[in-house]
Design a protein with these regions (language model features):
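Single conserved hydrophobic/aromatic residue that forms the stacking wall/gate
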Residues: 1-9, 173-176
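Stable alpha-helical structural segments in soluble proteins, enriched in small hydrophobic residues
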Residues: 95-103, 134, 163, 167
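Conserved beta-ketoacyl condensing-enzyme motif
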Residues: 6, 10-16, 107-123, 138
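A short beta-alpha structural unit
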Residues: 75-80, 112-120, 145-152
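Conserved catalytic cysteine-centered active-site region
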Residues: 20-45, 128-158
């Protein structure tokens, strides 16, 4: 028999970030890395985790008497597609504008932004500038990746749940 093994099968997905020079060199110091939005950031740290959100139409949830934790009132997505670790400020801003338009909200109605916050220099700078240009300097922004690392496919669900809990408790987190 002949067996084939692709590089994709042999290497963990997380090694892609090493190849892109996007990972922190401070993995041995979890209390100081990753540091999203910090001048001492040096890249992301891969974390492990899992999460799931159950989404359903509001009317259906109400009809069955479900406890509703949160409602998604707007959504926006955009990608420049140029490079995985070099996002564009204008593209990030446009995604946030699309979400506001979909929700029929103004930027003034938003009180907190949970950013992607990978702790990569170019990503954090582009994200900060995009957020600042749309919401102004008053907007608090953080990312749970400072506590968990980048959990790859799980980060959207996990960070969404953390935001739901923060809204419920009317608190926001600081960065690690």
């Amino acid at each position: 028999e002949i067996y084939t093994l692709s590089l994709h099968d042999a290497l963990p997905f997380s090694m892609v970030f090493d190849a892109l020079y996007a990972t922190s060199l401070k993995n041995d110091a979890p209390h100081t890395s990753p540091r999203p939005y910090d001048s001492d950031r040096d890249g992301l740290v891969i974390g492990e985790g899992g999460g799931m959100l159950v989404l359903e139409e509001l009317e259906h949830a109400l009809a069955r008497g479900a406890h509703i934790h949160a409602e998604i009132v707007g959504f926006g997505s955009n990608a420049d597609g140029a490079h995985a670790t070099r996002p564009e400020q204008t593209t990030m801003r446009r995604a946030m504008e699309l979400a506001l338009e979909d929700a029929h909200l103004s930027a003034d109605a938003i009180g907190y932004v949970n950013g992607h916050g990978t702790a990569t220099e170019q990503g954090d700078i582009a994200e900060t500038l995009a957020t600042h240009s749309l919401f102004g300097a008053r907007m608090p922004i953080s990312s749970q990746k400072s506590f968990l690392g980048h959990t790859l496919g799980a980060c959207g669900a996990l960070e969404s749940w953390f935001c739901i809990e923060m809204m419920k408790d009317r608190k926001s987190t600081r960065l690690n």
